[in-house]
């Protein structure tokens, strides 16, 4: 019997993507983001999530999508990759 893969789906622009639920730690509304000087343009900065400092990547910029102004539907998907937490800004999750 094949193991079922559960995913969290989200959109970036008009494209839909998915991440294995096993790496998703949480999904939060976009809080205040502190910018990081001299970081690549797709690194929005960092957030303080209950005492944890999480770097935040804007996937629209990373994938060359048109960047639109943030709105209340945007979310940050916090994932764990190689024992590090990273926040991914997405259009909706």
Predicted ranges, named:
Residues 1-93:
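An acidic, low-aromatic, low-complexity terminal/linker signal
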């Amino acid at each position: 019997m094949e193991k079922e893969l559960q995913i969290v789906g989200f959109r970036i622009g008009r494209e839909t993507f998915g991440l294995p639920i096993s790496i998703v730690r949480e999904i939060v509304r976009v809080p205040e983001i502190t910018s990081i000087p001299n970081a690549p343009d797709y690194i929005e900065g960092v957030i303080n999530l209950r005492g944890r400092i999480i770097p935040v990547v804007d996937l629209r910029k990373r994938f060359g999508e048109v960047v639109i102004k943030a709105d209340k539907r945007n979310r940050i998907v916090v994932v764990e990759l190689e024992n590090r937490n990273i926040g991914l800004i997405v259009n909706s999750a």
